[in-house]
């Protein structure tokens, strides 16, 4: 995939306000830790995550996305009528039907000819949305579009902790550990063809993207509902973290080779990378496998955890705000999502 007239003009975000430490979660798991003689502090030691953020109880997902969207509109000064598409891409959503994007679009006051829909692709949702909007722009169908997402980890972590205490086995502990890394946040990305009179000067050019998949591994990480009684369902999430990391790194290596060849880049020509945020071990193994020096990557998982689809774009926004990403940098967005899918974007910052 190659693009010649697609630009990212805003990466606006909203962080959830409730800070939850790893030690706080461990205190709730004290009976399990005592049974297996696990010392306190292991969650942070194993993941590198000391805290994450959650939305308040009763928070509606689309509210977070709406707030981020308003920030993006304020930053760019874009006329909402120019948005040819609004796509919501979170793993979490308000309901099955209608599309969560509909409430967000209504709050923004978009025009009647705006395409409004949801896209779902595990933690790669926002990247999938970016490419979907980019294709529309490159084809000349629209001049601008917005990708929005909001993720919430509170409910699934609470359910998981209850399940870990009710079924205190080492296998259940291992399959549940990844869930405890979940964080919460929202993001809005505005893309244009570069022709609109915006008030900001941000204009990061999307150059191209590569995507490879390994769907035979679709069972390694699952989040959904399971029947626990007659017409009684409970949310669950389980992850084979060891195998997921192994197969994810292998897929990332092939995608990286494809990406560099398509862009005609050497690995040394990639100035900075922004990765989906999972944890310390994942970061170390992925960067090592791709021969990327750690100083070229900007981590946020230590204080934000894994925010699903929101992690990578929020990390990019923070990296920009803190001067890590500079004008002219050749930047790669690197994402691996359950399924397995791997997606990499090339951007001239």
Curated annotation (Swiss-Prot):
Give the InterPro entries listed for this entry.
ACP_syn_III_C, Thiolase-like
Classification via SUPFAM superfamilies: Thiolase-like
Positions bearing the site annotation: Important for activity: 276
Q: Where is the active site?
A: 97, 123
Gene deletion effect: Deletion of the entire oleABCD gene cluster leads to the complete absence of nonpolar extractable products. The oleABCD deletion strain shows a significantly longer lag phase than the wild-type strain when shifted to a lower temperature.
EC number of this enzyme: 2.3.3.20
Show the GO MF annotations: acyltransferase activity
What UniProt keywords apply to this chain's record, in alphabetical order?
Acyltransferase, Transferase
**What's its catalytic activity?**
a 1,2-saturated acyl-CoA + an acyl-CoA + H2O = an (R)-2-alkyl-3-oxoalkanoate + 2 CoA + H(+)
Q: Name one GO biological process term.
A: secondary metabolite biosynthetic process
Describe the function of this protein.
Involved in olefin biosynthesis. Catalyzes a non-decarboxylative head-to-head Claisen condensation of two acyl-CoA molecules, generating an (R)-2-alkyl-3-oxoalkanoate. The S.oneidensis oleABCD genes produce 3,6,9,12,15,19,22,25,28-hentriacontanonaene, which may aid the cells in adapting to a sudden drop in temperature.
Protein family per UniProt: Belongs to the thiolase-like superfamily. OleA family.
Q: Which NCBIfam families does the UniProt record give? A: PRK09258.1 (NF006720)
Q: What is this protein called?
A: Acyl-CoA:acyl-CoA alkyltransferase
Taxonomic lineage of the native organism: Bacteria, Pseudomonadati, Pseudomonadota, Gammaproteobacteria, Alteromonadales
Q: Which gene is the coding source of this polypeptide chain?
A: oleA
């Amino acid at each position: 995939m190659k693009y010649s007239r697609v630009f990212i003009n805003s990466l606006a975000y909203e962080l959830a306000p409730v800070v939850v430490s790893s030690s706080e979660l461990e205190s709730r798991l004290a009976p399990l830790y005592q049974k297996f003689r696990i010392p306190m502090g292991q969650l942070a030691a194993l993941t590198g995550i000391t805290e994450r953020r959650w939305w308040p109880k009763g928070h509606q997902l689309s509210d977070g996305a709406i707030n981020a969207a308003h920030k993006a509109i304020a930053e760019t000064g874009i006329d909402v009528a120019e948005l040819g598409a609004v796509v919501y891409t979170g793993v979490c959503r308000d309901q099955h039907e209608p599309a969560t994007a509909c409430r967000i679009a209504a709050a923004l006051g978009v025009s009647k000819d705006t395409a409004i829909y949801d896209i779902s692709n595990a933690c790669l949702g926002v990247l999938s949305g970016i490419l979907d909007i980019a294709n529309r722009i490159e084809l000349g169908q629209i001049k601008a579009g917005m990708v929005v997402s909001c993720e919430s980890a509170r409910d699934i972590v609470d359910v998981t902790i209850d399940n870990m205490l009710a079924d205190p086995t080492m296998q259940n502990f291992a399959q549940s550990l990844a869930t405890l890394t979940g964080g919460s946040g929202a993001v809005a990305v505005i893309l244009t063809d570069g022709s609109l009179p915006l008030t900001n000067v941000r204009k990061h050019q999307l150059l191209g993207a590569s995507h490879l998949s390994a769907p035979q591994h679709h069972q390694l990480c699952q989040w959904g509902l399971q029947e626990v009684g007659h017409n009684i369902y409970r949310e669950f999430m389980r992850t084979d973290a060891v195998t997921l990391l192994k197969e994810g790194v292998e897929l990332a290596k092939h995608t990286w080779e494809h990406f560099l060849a398509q862009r005609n880049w050497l690995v040394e020509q990639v100035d900075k990378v922004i990765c989906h945020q999972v944890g310390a071990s994942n970061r170390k193994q992925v960067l090592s496998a791709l021969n990327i020096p750690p100083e070229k990557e900007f981590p946020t998982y230590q204080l934000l955890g894994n925010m699903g689809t929101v992690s990578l774009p929020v990390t990019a926004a923070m990296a920009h705000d803190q001067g890590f990403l500079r004008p002219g940098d050749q930047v790669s967005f690197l994402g691996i999502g359950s399924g397995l899918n791997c997606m990499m974007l090339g951007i001239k910052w």
